[in-house]
Amino acid sequence: MPTFVDPSKCDGCKGGEKTACMYICPNDLMILDPEEMKAFNQEPEACWECYSCIKICPQGAITARPYADFAPMGGTCIPLRGSEDIMWTIKFRNGSVKRFKFPIRTTPEGSIKPFEGKPEAGDLENELLFTETALTVPQVALGQKAQIADAETSQCWFDLPCEGGNR
């Protein structure tokens, strides 16, 4: 569902150098027409369909044209974003309207602690990665030989010398 700008609603973010939709578009598709001072999607086929431009537009000038299997040709999708949820309004070409409301977040903002319980970063001399913990050799296995079928010599942990000269 690529996005389209309604020129009658777009005010070019009050004549600024960069509109909100230009700022937020990850694919740099939204541009400002310097003559009319209206934003538009320069390549709708390349739209990633993230709908960031729709959600950020202060005038509600950007809409998504839904795929035919979702809403028949001529329909539009319009979001209304609140602080806790987003409501999508689907206008069908016959005039009927349906609304769907979804939460924006399922966890309180700031409640996720991704590095909790992880070691402190900054030890560049450590051979372990940031998230790795040191692995130790099991005490039971130290000094015991591990028999490997069809091997010429037996192998053991490297803490003690192995018989047969292999290390």
Curated annotation (Swiss-Prot):
Q: Name one Pfam family in it.
A: Fer4_7
Marked site, Important for the electron transfer from the iron-sulfur cluster 1 to the FAD of AprA, at W48
Tell me the Gene Ontology biological-process terms attached to this UniProt entry.
Answer: dissimilatory sulfate reduction; protein heterotetramerization
Known cofactor(s): [4Fe-4S] cluster
UniProt keyword annotations, A-Z: 4Fe-4S, Cytoplasm, Electron transport, Iron, Iron-sulfur, Metal-binding, Transport
Cofactor comment: Binds 2 [4Fe-4S] clusters.
Which stretch is the leader sequence? none
Q: What is its main location?
A: cytoplasm
Q: Does the keyword 4Fe-4S apply?
A: yes
Which residues make up the binding site for [4Fe-4S] cluster 2? C25, C47, C50, C53
Q: Site annotation (Important for interaction with AprA at the substrate channel entrance): which residues?
A: E152, D159, E163
Annotated GO MF terms = 4 iron, 4 sulfur cluster binding; metal ion binding; protein heterodimerization activity
Q: Where in the cell is it found?
A: Cytoplasm
Superkingdom as given in the UniProt entry: Bacteria
pH-dependence of activity, as noted: Optimum pH is 7.4 for the adenylylsulfate reductase.
Q: Where is the 4Fe-4S ferredoxin-type domain?
A: 1-35, 38-67
Supply the InterPro entries for this chain: 4Fe4S_Fe-S-bd (IPR017896), 4Fe4S_Fe_S_CS (IPR017900), AprB (IPR011802), AprB_C (IPR022738), APS_reduc_Bsu_C_sf (IPR038465), Fe-S_Ferredoxin (IPR050572)
Q: What does this protein do?
A: Iron-sulfur cluster subunit of the adenylylsulfate reductase which catalyzes reversibly the reduction of adenosine 5'-phosphosulfate (APS) to sulfite and AMP during dissimilatory sulfate reduction. The iron-sulfur cluster 2 is thought to accept electrons from a still unknown electron donor and transfer electrons to the iron-sulfur cluster 1 of this protein and then onto the FAD of AprA.
Assembly information from the UniProt record: Heterodimer composed of AprA and AprB. The heterodimers can dimerize to form heterotetramers.
Domain comment in the entry: Consists of three sections from the N- to the C-terminus: [4Fe-4S] cluster-binding domain, beta-sheet and C-terminal tail. The beta-sheet and the C-terminal tail interact with AprA to stabilize the AprA/AprB heterodimer.
Q: What is this protein called?
A: Adenylylsulfate reductase subunit beta
Gene source species: Megalodesulfovibrio gigas (strain ATCC 19364 / DSM 1382 / NCIMB 9332 / VKM B-1759) (Desulfovibrio gigas)
Q: Write the gene name.
A: aprB
